[in-house]
Structure formats: structure tokens, C-alpha cells
Design a protein with these regions (language model features):
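The feature captures the catalytic groove of carbohydrate-active enzymes
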Residues: 2-20, 25-42, 53-57, 68-120, ...
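Substrate-binding groove/exosite segments of carbohydrate-active enzymes
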Residues: 36-38, 44-58, 65, 69-76, ...
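Long, low-complexity segments enriched in small/aliphatic residues
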Residues: 412-413
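Short, intrinsically disordered, charge-balanced linker/junction segments flanking boundaries
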Residues: 431-435
Length: 435
């Protein structure tokens, strides 16, 4: 245990002790008068709250002899704030103790950090073996090019950060991102998590809990899905315009998750709310009933698209195709035929309306009437629905040759070798020599 002290007393005492003989002794106790500032203000550097300690192990070695020292570092923070904490006002409420607490899932499995350490010790061989098998498959026994491996592994690491967590009832949840002390983008946002695939394919049982929340708890009687999952903390429903790509993407993810798990009961339980969500989509975003979306479509960009556009409409087509197949599995013949007809008509019409011979465009005659539209531009995200369709295993939702042409166009018009001559006042994800 380190000396508590003021200023850097703790580090100084540790360093003096350690550099003396390489061994760790009990902290030094001093009766010397400290800094008087502490009598006037609660300076953190004078009245420290944190407790610090060090662990050391030693052996006497002969010249050239080697010895391995293993340490098991575990932690146990059983409770978390029962609220989404993102903004300053949320953090201030937390500091005032206005929120309750809820247990983390691992608190239902272990009693303390020592219990966790014992589990690691007794299962070390299996845990190490499984971890190495995964690493070997990812890095050493694959034919994937390096840039694909880099993209995959860079995103997988998010799972072991504070970005996401699991609550005591088993529900998996997460932010859009994290800052150094709080989250950013709270609520397991469907139109953000829509594009993540890691959890679904590595831990499908966790991913399934997100679908249960989205449909069974956050989709109302009209079929409208909330854009943020506040129910996981028993907070009031988040009031905001629904996200077209998020809600329809969640429909696709239901089928993907069913295929990953083979859980028919999961599908049967969630199916009525899926039907409601699709009814809402057809009324809210397909205003003229031609199975091509043309209404006001809120998206993950935090803007709305107006009129037919390939980004949201490709997700809509993927949702229709998934629903056609799911309806057959659960024995809902009426909706099976409804979705089959809508998909067939919608796919043909969307391709006819939006494919310009090279890629898919937004169809909007009054393009200047609305801000932030891309019109005839080559949107890099134009085939997100096709991507989700592939992830759900339903193949092409648009003509294969047109999909190929559109993908080639995305690369042709959007790939840059550097950003020295690209002006942007928006969020900068790449500058100068980055690509």
C-alpha cells in the first residue's frame, strides 16, 4: 500500500523504497507538518481519495537463469449508475447522487475480485487456448488481405472497452462512442449499432438481447421504434423522430440473429412487433404506396433524406426480403405473401428509378428545397442495405451487375489517396496524408 500523503508524497515514497533494494516495504509514516492549503480548500492533490498499491515478487537467480512471474489482475465493480450518462447535466446529477444503481452482469456470477481471480486461475489453460485459437485464426491462418484484418481487429477491440456493458438481467447495451470519463451517444442507438457486426457473430446471445429491447420494449403500438433504448434503465421513452435506417435495419438484424442462433422461439416471440414495425415503415416512409420509400427519412447522419434514395431504400428492400423469409418460418402465410409481393415490386421499381447506368442516385426534383441532399452524387453508403442483406444471408436485393457497378463507382468517385486538397468543416476522420 502506497503512502497516502500530499502532492507527490506517494510516488516519491514508493520510488525511494523500490530503487533502494528492489524490494517493496511498508509505506513510510511521517509526522511532519504538511501543506496548510488543505485547511482552506479541498484540493484534490492535498486530500487524495484514490488508494494506490503495488505488488512485487522476487526470486534469487543464478547467472543466465530465467524465471517467469505471472500475475492475475482482476477487478470487481458490481454496480453501475442506473442511467445513461453523456451530458454535463447528467454527470452533475450523478455527482449529486440523483441516480440509483443497477448491478453489472458479472456481479451475478462472482462475489468479489478474488473470486474472479480464482476463476481465471482454475480456467487459465482453457482461456489461453481459446484466445490463441482466435488470434491464430484472425492473424496467422487466414488468406484475408492485411487491410481487411486491420479493419476487423480495430473494431473488435471496442468490445473490451467501456463502450458497452451488460446489465444484471443479461441485457447487452452500449454507447455510440466514449470519452475519457463518460459515454458519447447514449442508448444503444439502432441507427448506429445497425452497422456493427462484431457482437452478432462472436457473441450472438448478447446481440439477441438488443433485438429484444428494440422490439419488445421500445417499439410502441403504432410500430414506431425509439431511437434510443432508455428502457434498459427504466427511464422515460426517448422523444425524437424515428430513424428510418435504424428501425428497418433492426428488422434485418432479427433475421441475421435468428440465423446465427437458430432460435425459433426468439423469432416467434419478436415477430408480432416486427410486423408492426414494417406496417409503420410502409405508412410513414412509403407515402405513395409503390414500395419505394419517398417520405421524410431520418438517418444516422442526423439529417433527413427526402424522396427515393438508395441508402434507406436498400435497407427497406433487405427488410422486406428478410420478412418474407421470416414469415414463412413462423407460418404467417398472409404476411409472407404481402412481403414477397412488396419486395418483388419494390426491388424492380427502385432499380428502375435510381440506377443511372453507373450507380444509384437520389430521385428528388426539388433538390434545393431541402438541405443536405446528395441528389445525383455518388453516395458512398448507397448500398448499406445490400451489405446488411449479405450479413443476413439473403443475397442480392438489387440486380447483381448493378450492385457491382455501383460498388466500383463508390471506389472510383470517393476513394482518395490523401486529403491535402479536400476542404471540410465537418467532423474530420482523415486529414493530410491519411486515407
Amino acid at each position: 500500500k502506497w503512502l497516502h500523503g500530499q502532492w507527490t508524497d506517494n510516488a516519491q515514497d514508493f520510488w525511494d523504497d523500490f530503487t533502494g533494494d528492489g524490494l517493496l516495504e511498508k509505506e513510510t509514516v511521517s509526522d511532519s507538518v504538511g501543506c496548510e492549503f488543505a485547511q482552506f480548500h479541498n484540493f484534490s492533490f492535498l486530500k487524495r481519495r484514490e488508494k494506490i498499491g503495488s505488488i512485487g515478487a522476487w526470486e534469487e537467480l543464478q547467472p543466465g537463469e530465467e524465471r517467469t512471474f505471472e500475475f492475475v489482475i482482476t477487478w470487481y465493480f458490481p454496480n453501475r449508475v442506473k442511467a445513461w450518462i453523456e451530458f454535463d447535466e447528467d454527470y452533475e446529477k450523478f455527482q449529486r447522487g440523483e441516480y440509483g444503481t443497477v448491478r453489472n452482469y458479472y456481479a451475478t456470477k462472482f462475489t468479489d475480485a478474488w473470486d474472479v481471480a480464482k476463476y481465471v486461475y482454475h480456467n487459465k489453460e482453457r482461456l489461453e487456448s481459446d484466445s490463441r485459437k482466435f488470434a491464430d485464426a484472425m492473424f496467422h491462418k487466414t488468406t484475408l488481405p492485411y487491410y481487411v484484418i486491420d479493419a476487423l481487429t480495430a473494431n473488435i477491440t471496442n468490445l473490451r472497452s467501456n463502450l458497452c456493458f451488460r446489465l444484471e438481467d443479461g441485457t447487452f447495451a452500449g454507447f455510440e462512442g466514449i470519452r475519457d470519463y463518460i459515454g458519447c451517444g447514449y442508448g444503444s442507438v439502432p441507427h448506429v449499432w445497425n452497422y456493427a457486426q462484431t457482437v452478432a457473430f462472436l457473441f450472438p446471445d448478447l446481440e439477441k438481447t438488443m433485438r429484444n429491447v428494440e422490439f419488445l420494449r421500445e417499439t410502441d403500438e403504432t410500430g414506431c421504434m425509439s431511437t434510443r433504448m432508455f428502457s434498459v434503465f427504466d427511464q422515460e421513452r426517448y422523444a425524437m423522430v424515428p430513424a428510418c435506417d435504424g428501425e428497418l435495419g433492426s428488422v434485418v438484424r432479427v433475421y441475421r440473429d435468428f440465423k446465427n442462433l437458430g432460435d425459433v422461439e426468439f423469432l416467434k416471440t419478436i415477430w408480432p412487433k416486427v410486423v408492426l414495425a414494417m406496417e409503420y415503415a410502409l405508412k410513414q416512409w412509403d407515402l405513395d404506396g409503390d414500395d419505394v420509400l419517398d417520405g421524410q427519412q431520418n438517418t444516422t447522419y442526423d439529417i433527413e433524406f427526402y424522396g427515393p434514395n438508395p441508402m434507406t431504400d436498400s435497407i427497406f428492400l433487405a427488410a422486406l426480403k428478410c420478412c418474407e423469409e421470416m414469415a414463412e418460418i413462423v407460418g404467417d402465410e398472409e404476411h409472407h405473401q404481402l412481403y414477397a409481393d412488396a419486395y418483388e415490386k419494390g426491388s424492380a421499381r427502385a432499380d428502375q428509378m435510381m440506377f443511372d447506368g453507373e450507380y444509384y442516385i437520389q430521385v428528388q426534383k426539388e433538390i434545393d428545397k431541402y438541405k443536405y441532399q446528395f441528389g445525383k452524387g455518388c453516395l458512398s453508403d448507397q448500398l448499406l442495405g445490400q451489405f446488411l442483406a449479405y450479413m443476413a444471408g439473403i443475397g442480392e436485393i438489387l440486380p447483381k451487375e448493378h450492385v457491382k457497378s455501383a460498388m466500383e463507382s463508390v471506389f472510383k468517385y470517393n476513394y482518395k489517396t490523401d486529403f491535402y486538397h479536400t476542404d471540410s468543416v465537418h467532423r474530420a476522420y482523415a486529414i493530410n496524408e491519411k486515407r
